[in-house]
Amino acid sequence: MSGLNAEQLDEIEERVTELLEKPWRKGKGRQKELSLREALIVTCGYKRNNITEEIWAEIFDVDQSTISRYITFLTPLVDQGTAEFRPGAQEAADAIRGAVALVDGTLWPCWSWAGERELWAGKYKTTGHGSLIITNLRGDIVYVSEPVPGNQHDMRKLQGSECAKILKLAGGVIGDKGFIGTDYITTPVRKPQGRELYMREHDYNNQVSSLRAPVERAVADLKTWRILFTDYRRPLRTFLTSFRAAIGLYFFKLSFA
């Protein structure tokens, strides 16, 4: 349910325990409804499956408010406990320097909160936050950018960003049509006005698409942490911490491979 095996849960529990200001289990008085391990299964499982708090409450036979409280409390600690596994910009630059890089933009969907018009992503026809994903030619993710409002298109996310600095160190970069206009990213040919693409242009686009396939698979794999794939339902102010926790858990799990 948590997306982690027993060994991985052991380590997460150890890391979170070190971050707690007070012991989870008190020596006296009323005890918490769930053990720390159970609460971490809920918190990590919420990131993995994005099923409702009500269902988690039924699974553990507690109130929904208890589940919500534990997720709220433990998510920042999971974020902190897995932070070292999230690749930083310098680490990504070192990994991709002189090599071929792939880049893709993606959306992390969320509810349509009233008054948050900047979350509307016209390309996806829904609301959410967007990031850029950088991989090597094999599709290994080397960098996930911080999320920005969904109304920012890929070129806007790229301009002046850490991603741009990383990609400019690569030996070559391949992206989709969203990156047309840069002088360092190879993209498909856009259909010109007034005519169809020539056969050689179709062939070229197919080659670019084939080379880009690993980054698309990598994004799909990242989104097996379903909180990144289906609508984020918790309060908007909690999204960034939840996002970082989910990304951290993804790379934490990979470290056991």
Briefly describe each language-model feature range:
Residues 5, 35, 198-200:
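Ser/Thr-centered flexible coil motifs
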